[in-house]
Swiss-Prot record:
PANTHER family according to UniProt: PHOSPHOPANTETHEINE ADENYLYLTRANSFERASE
CDD domains in alphabetical order: PPAT (cd02163)
Gene that specifies this protein: coaD
Necessary cofactors: Mg(2+)
Entry similarity comment: Belongs to the bacterial CoaD family.
EC number(s) recorded for this UniProt protein: 2.7.7.3
Gene Ontology CC, one term: cytoplasm
Protein's recorded name: Phosphopantetheine adenylyltransferase
Catalytic activity from the UniProt record: (R)-4'-phosphopantetheine + ATP + H(+) = 3'-dephospho-CoA + diphosphate
Coiled coil location: none
Length: 161
């Protein structure tokens, strides 16, 4: 049997401690884990795809089986190109489940060979989102407990221009 390969897609604008928690836990389960950084055209990003990738590479440097790449198009197609058999999605609350279930069902329809794995976030991060981090930081709030230090510095630099 070959390597167990999975993809964790997201905009990660910016990556939070909640994202990192899911990545670290998935990295223990899968032999190879691709963090695919997406550019969501419906959102105005704070960071470029390249900046987000660099931050993710820094905070996952201790995980040798994690690879950070940018991706566009359908996640299920990207996963297939990488030889992945799984897409990992973090769930913060029941409210995330309905949306994620619809996406998982569509992905299953498009490619029945790729499973979606839902991972419940650590309860201490259940309220956390990139949008919330940006909102707090915009008003000079303290985000040190919400994001890795490299991200804290980068977010502060963006809002203190």
């Amino acid at each position: 049997m070959g390597n167990k390969i999975a993809v964790i897609p997201g905009t990660f604008d910016p990556i939070t401690n909640g994202h990192l928690d899911i990545i670290e836990r998935a990295a223990k389960i899968f032999d190879v884990l691709y963090v695919s950084v997406l550019n969501n055209s419906s959102k105005k990003p704070l960071f470029t795809v390249e900046e987000r990738m660099e931050m993710i590479k820094q905070v996952t440097a201790h995980l040798p089986n994690v690879h950070v790449e940018s991706a566009s198009g359908l996640t299920v197609d990207y996963a297939a190109k990488r030889g992945a058999t799984a897409i990992v999605r973090g769930l913060r609350a029941v409210s995330d489940f309905e949306y994620e279930m619809q996406i998982a069902s569509m992905n299953r329809t498009l490619n029945a060979d790729i499973e979606t794995f839902f991972v419940m976030t650590n309860t201490k991060y259940s309220f956390l989102s990139s949008s919330m981090v940006k909102e707090v930081a915009q008003y000079q709030g303290d985000i040190r407990e919400l994001v890795p230090e490299v991200v804290n510095k980068a977010v502060k630099a963006k809002f203190n221009k």
